[in-house]
């Protein structure tokens, strides 16, 4: 009893503290300058305005501001500052310590940082070709708070009058002068970012062609703005220190290197001696394998997922692809690739692999609440990430739940699922779900599938082809009361509690225009799905003499009608960036499902619906749309 009282008091104190904190935040929101020293000001708001120019969005310039206001929620509420202001001057108090720890101290206005911000903004505008840009500031001071605005007048930008290339190496000159791929042209607006991207393009192309030691930092630009009004001459050339090297030193830089051998080090420890009994090594066709303990992956599997091949030229793209391919293998946690020069024009490639957890077991227990019914659920999962020593990933999950219903009944559900993923992006899944409601029905659901996933990350597009999608719903028992109330011929729910087969295939994909290099630009997300079912079975029904249901006239497989339908879904989301920390999101869904042939309605699990705790809460789950109906139950 004493223990219970103690815990209860602790919980009560925590609840009281949270309530007081909430009230304090609301009250302190009106006194944001509580901890602002006398004679100083709180930086309340910072804005950036660019006059009559859409080439340089204000959102892209915010990152150059050296001092920003306190963090805001919903664009106006400084919640963390409000929490901080609930603290008292006595820092020893527990509530004061936590308020200062959770909250955010006020940002004190600094004129020095304003000057630094103006310098950075001026430099950013210069990099975009606006060398005559003017940066001004305006301040509004009220109640010891400062609202600060940066006003940028770009004026006319400079353009490139003449772009020239002066490089000693013929291969390098050929790459830089390639008009098909170059990013810099005469007449374009001067842009330091594009010039830097051109350096990266030239250097990357050289490294793809075998020039291992070539780097973008070896290239430089010289600009002359005295040639014309608001015009610049730009010349690409080698860095001064490169031009001063001897011919032999230049030859090392402009030499094509080949891969001699590829070394795989699996769980390699350089402190172990070669004669260590737990360390093993083997070699084949230019590949060398070194591992400690039990071999992690088959050698053929590693070779298949390594685009870097002995005898090939060094290629930067192949290095990136090797990183991507090896990191996708389930048992591998860490990948590191390095190169060692072993002769005048040869490199050895060293790939270090570190294994992750091969086996994982998880368990969970939770309380559930659905449509007014309380329950309890427990689940267990097992994952093997290297089932056949070929990076195959097996996942097995089981879950059981017990629910107390408002009408005094109960519901039991048990389900198990298994999925086997192969490195080739093929996955096989199986599942079984058992539902028992003693006052209503008993239902079993079997499903199986075979799918292939194909990703194109460079354009933000993923594809998923589901070659086999099988579902079998079987209800061995339905109570008479439930049948009379819900399953009359005029009630739409009747079709939700019928045995049926679904044998289909489908394709789905998703696309995003988000680019990590431009995180503050607005972007689209698109998801689409196409699926059909029953066409193959309907084509085989007549020649194979399938049974025909006498009541509906539909074909049956194993005394069960199979569904035939087509379905298409599209989901579009547009993220309008208002500020680096704020965005407005528009979302639209469109879907159509058409039964035909062997079906008069869409199967229950493939229908569209709304309602429920996680949807439109005014309606119970699956009782809202699309369309409407009036059941007789």
Model-derived regions: residue spans:
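Short beta-strand elements
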Residues: 131-139, 212-221, 333-340, 461-468, ...
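Extracytoplasmic gating/loop element in the C-terminal half of outer-membrane beta-barrel translocons
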Residues: 584-633
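Interaction-mediating elements
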Residues: 31-328, 360
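C-terminal motif of bacterial Sec signal peptides marking the signal peptidase cleavage site
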Residues: 27-29
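Transmembrane beta-strand segments of outer-membrane beta-barrel domains in Gram-negative
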Residues: 208, 360, 410-591, 631-632
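Outer-membrane beta-barrel initiation region
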Residues: 247-424, 496-503, 511-521, 539
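N-terminal secretory signal peptides that target proteins for export/translocation
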Residues: 1-13
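Flexible glycine-/small-residue-rich
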Residues: 50-52, 152-156, 167-169, 236-240, ...
